[in-house]
């Protein structure tokens, strides 16, 4: 007679330490687990509820400025080093690890309009309304700077923004009518690019195709330049003015625009006739935007005193952050590891937020990491179930934002009803403006 017995090795089954996890033996045959899907649904529901319970996005604030924060920039090599410039001409360096101030300097008379680190991280360049550009040397290893200025570049007009080309000594500034290209070693601009006579408010270098440059103007234009030539390449005219622009760090052809019409637009510069995506949850002018270093999300700061995080392929925001004391948000910034967001507002504070509101901040064991990955998978699997979707997407917002959002939705529904009624009563289909193309007025080459 043949008898089957369970045979196990003593070495494999014996724990070396009392804290070791005992190995569990499972039979993964689906016929033995008829309630596998209901169990996964309950786990997904519990994980979604716990996400909302542990959603504590606010980490802390960086206080010390005596005026509104107008611009911020992150260090290219240090995760915890950030610089900020305020409306009273003060520049401060911050340590994000300890949420403390490294150093401060009175840099300009008037607004600090632009701030950027050089690609090697050893210098910082700032520009202001006092018609000067100043280069500061960072003292290693603390990465602080003293009151001494290495170089001063004088301009004919006030500067509105600045950006540095990657792996080069070239930087660009914007002003009342033109974009100027500078070198560290030259006291005058080596190149002047102009298209029209309106004030250029923002300028940004492409991080991949480093010879490409984008700018936005006060007369609703987005202008693209190629600094290898002495003339602009393309001009996009939009329905309303743009306040800020940002290049995608992973796709050289994707450009995001923060607009006065309360939306964020993503354009493919190879085809500017229509937008790729429209992100439309704000109820006030969008003042600043920034891509995450992964290129998968966009953070935006608005005149409605809220911060929103958008997936690049979704028109709805994933998260909305606000506090009772936070005012108009002039500047937003992702940290280099994509885990945190900085916001600079008119209330003289920089606030630090988690990009994922329920993410733990401590060091995780391998089992904890596996658990979080599993929960993310099952939440993704059941995300379209109405009960889970309601819990996952529900957010509390200020009453003013809620009312404006309600009115905005009612206007949108009324337009849809009007189109439907015209079609039903006249027998003709009215011409409907497409969402992706109605923002574009014209494209000039």
From Swiss-Prot:
Major localisation: nucleus
Family label: Belongs to the WD repeat DCAF13/WDSOF1 family.
Subcellular locations according to the entry: Nucleus, Nucleolus
Protein name: DDB1- and CUL4-associated factor 13
Disulphide bond pairs: none
Record GO cellular component, one term: small-subunit processome
Sequence ranges of Basic and acidic residues compositional bias: 430-445
InterPro entries on file: G-protein_beta_WD-40_rep, Sof1, WD40/YVTN_repeat-like_dom_sf, WD40_repeat_CS, WD40_repeat_dom_sf, WD40_rpt, WD_repeat_DCAF13/WDSOF1
Pfam families found in the cross-reference section: Sof1, WD40
Gene Ontology annotations of biological process type: maturation of SSU-rRNA from tricistronic rRNA transcript (SSU-rRNA, 5.8S rRNA, LSU-rRNA); protein ubiquitination
SMART domains per record: WD40 (SM00320)
Chain's role: Possible role in ribosomal RNA processing. May function as a substrate receptor for CUL4-DDB1 E3 ubiquitin-protein ligase complex.
Encoding gene, per UniProt annotation: wdsof1
Highest taxon, organism lineage: Eukaryota
PANTHER family reported in the protein's UniProt record: DDB1- AND CUL4-ASSOCIATED FACTOR 13, U3 SMALL NUCLEOLAR RNA U3 SNORNA ASSOCIATED PROTEIN
Region (Disordered): 417-445
Keyword terms, alphabetized: Nucleus, Repeat, Ribonucleoprotein, Ribosome biogenesis, rRNA processing, Ubl conjugation pathway, WD repeat
Gene3D superfamilies documented for this protein: YVTN repeat-like/Quinoprotein amine dehydrogenase
Positions of WD repeats: 64-104, 107-146, 154-192, 196-235, 237-277, 281-320, 324-363
């Amino acid at each position: 007679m043949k008898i089957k017995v369970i045979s196990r090795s003593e070495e494999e089954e014996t724990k070396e330490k009392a804290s070791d996890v005992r190995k569990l033996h499972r039979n993964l045959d689906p016929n033995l687990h008829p309630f596998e899907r209901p169990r996964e649904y309950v786990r997904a529901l519990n994980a979604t509820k716990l996400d909302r319970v542990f959603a504590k996005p606010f980490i802390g604030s960086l206080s010390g400025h005596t005026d509104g924060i107008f611009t911020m920039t992150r260090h290219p090599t240090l995760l915890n080093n950030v610089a900020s410039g305020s409306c009273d001409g003060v520049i401060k360096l911050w340590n994000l690890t300890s949420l403390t101030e490294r150093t401060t300097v009175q840099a300009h008379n008037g607004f600090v309009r632009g701030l950027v680190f050089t690609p090697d991280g050893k210098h910082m360049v700032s520009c202001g309304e006092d018609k000067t550009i100043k280069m500061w040397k960072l003292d290693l290893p603390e990465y602080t700077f003293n009151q001494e200025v290495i170089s001063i570049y004088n301009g004919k007009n006030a500067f509105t923004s600045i950006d540095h080309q990657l792996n080069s000594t070239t930087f660009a500034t914007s002003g009342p009518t033109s974009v100027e290209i500078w070198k560290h070693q030259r006291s005058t601009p080596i190149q002047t690019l102009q298209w029209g006579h309106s004030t250029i408010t923002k300028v940004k270098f492409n991080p991949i195709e480093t010879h490409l440059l984008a700018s936005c103007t006060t007369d609703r234009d987005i202008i693209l330049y190629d600094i290898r030539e002495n003339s602009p390449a393309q001009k996009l005219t939009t329905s309303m003015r743009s306040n800020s622009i940002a290049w995608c760090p992973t796709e050289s052809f994707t450009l995001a625009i923060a607009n006065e019409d309360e939306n964020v637009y993503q354009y493919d510069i190879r085809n500017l006739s229509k937008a790729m995506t429209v992100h439309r949850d704000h109820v006030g002018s969008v003042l600043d935007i920034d891509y995450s270093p992964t290129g998968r999300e966009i953070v935006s700061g608005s005149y409605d005193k809220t911060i929103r995080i958008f997936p690049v392929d979704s028109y709805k925001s994933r998260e909305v952050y606000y506090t009772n004391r936070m005012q108009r948000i002039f500047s937003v910034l992702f940290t280099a590891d994509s885990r945190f967001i900085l916001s600079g507002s008119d209330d003289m504070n920089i606030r630090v937020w988690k990009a994922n509101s329920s993410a733990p901040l401590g060091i995780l064991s391998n089992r904890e990491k596996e658990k979080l990955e599993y929960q993310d998978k099952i939440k993704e699997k059941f995300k379209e179930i109405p009960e889970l979707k309601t819990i996952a997407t529900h957010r509390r917002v200020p009453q003013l934002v809620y009312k404006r959002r309600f009115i905005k939705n009612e206007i949108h529904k009324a337009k849809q009803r009007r189109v439907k009624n015209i079609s039903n009563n006249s027998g003709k289909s009215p011409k409907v403006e497409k969402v992706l193309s109605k923002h574009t007025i014209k494209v000039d080459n």
